[in-house]
Amino acid sequence: MAYVENCNANAQFQCSEIQKNVFLIGDSIRQGYCATVKEELSPDAQVFYVSDNCRNTQYVITNLKTWANMFSNPSMVDIVHFNCGHWDIAHWCGGELPLTSEQEYKRNIKIIIDMIRKLFPNAKIIFATTTTMNPNGTIGINPRTTAEIARYNDIAVSALEGDVVVNDLFAVTNDWDSDCYADYCHFTTDAFKELGKAVAEALKKTF
């Protein structure tokens, strides 16, 4: 049985035979930069993304096949750029434990990569590290720290195999001051544009 439909003329995402086809997966941070990435890569690439917040690693695992079936031909996707981390690392409602343990996170990243390889067989895979928290120490309802994020990023990178590329968005945002943040973890409009430009540059390097 095929993992996805081979060709779907009525699919929401119609792949181009001329341009690069890029699929962005991620949480609200991705939602904040995806429009800039699309603008920066035009006209060289078509940039696709679901409107949904892709939440945590478990959510990505359970929805990847559905998203793949939104493409006219998933085998024509050239690049899949993904991140999930903020939801996994968060201590929901201030609980003692993060949503996803370190061991579970590493396992889930491996599962996601394996699924991308099956569902998008010709795509280069880029893993984006999770971005930093507001350095002013603002505590959200679902807290996490930059130190925790750094640790989970290291765990994720250790799970990568083969030719998976790392786009280190943690490094991009690590020296940003609190003026770049709209709240405890989300960025201002201008900062999201800068993040989108950084993502676009990382994608261009794989063209």
Describe every region a protein language model picked out.
Residues 2-111, 147-150:
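Conserved SGNH/GDSL esterase-like catalytic core that processes O-acyl groups on lipids
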Residues 60, 64, 70, 180-207:
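Histidine-centered active-site loop/cap adjacent to the catalytic His
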Residues 87, 129-134, 167-176:
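Mobile beta-alpha loop/short-helix "lid" or hinge segments that flank ligand
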Residues 90-99, 134-141, 179-182:
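Surface-exposed, active-site-proximal loop segments in enzymatic domains
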Residues 112-116:
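Hydrophobic positions in alpha-helices of CheY-like receiver
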Residues 120-124:
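A short helix->loop->beta-strand "cap" motif at the edges of active sites that frequently abuts
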Residues 133-169:
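Substrate-gating cap/lid alpha-helix
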